[in-house]
């Protein structure tokens, strides 16, 4: 009887696998802004929704994921909201449908002996500044900083160094003087005594100091065409991801890290736990977009991106709360 039950269970599992809907999801890097995505995957929430998720980590920043989405080589992107604005200025319709992080989580770090002083912005001149990749939100950060202080992009060298361990190594090895990046890189730099945080946009106040307001960052987004053609898949992805946001809210940083694959954890585990603890405040609790907050990234992009500045951007078409609201009505954690 037991063998029969086991065999039946195995057949049911095979049938469920065969009926699973395939969806390709890509992420620019496993910085902590994107953490709800691997948490949902590790806890099996996408499988629970009947999805067979294929994941690609470009490990080079959000601009690469955006390119893949527009080219049709991925279905859903895990990246920053500001890319939806950028695409609308190019007459391409990309829509955010779950907000993961409600603040940037970005910092500007320097070596311990750096002579750059944020109180004297001109001291950044001549510096090599590491970002995740050209066209990424870390790139937007430094360009906005330069613009706000009446400095030119030509006053510095902007260099793509990736994120996580690669970014930390670039600073440690002297390939760059300053680093614009996320946790865990930010916490690793400090914990290892490799440098110090000079500008910190991880908190609400920090975001207001840097950007002038709350700056929504990591979201799940897809092309409008894909959303229109696959609303059930988008809903299932949303259900699983919102469930992960709820789960993260209810668990400690240590419990969250314990659920992640070892190869996801950058640096030593204790430092990574500290990084997750530092980042927990940036995550959305319910996945909803707050329309007023979306004005901040629009203002930032307009300040240095000519295409965005010249375009008439309709923020209402850059996001939707439809699927998050449906997930909330479904309930469950």
Locations of the language-model features?
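Sec/Tat signal peptide C-region and signal peptidase I cleavage site
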Residues: 14-20
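Secondary-structure end/capping motifs
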Residues: 227-307
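Extracytoplasmic/secreted envelope proteins and their assembly/folding machinery
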Residues: 34, 66, 81-84, 121, ...
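Pocket-lining segment of extracytoplasmic ligand-binding domains
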Residues: 166-261
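Short, solvent-exposed loop/beta-turn-alpha elements that line the ligand-binding surface or hinge
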Residues: 48, 116, 202-213, 281-290
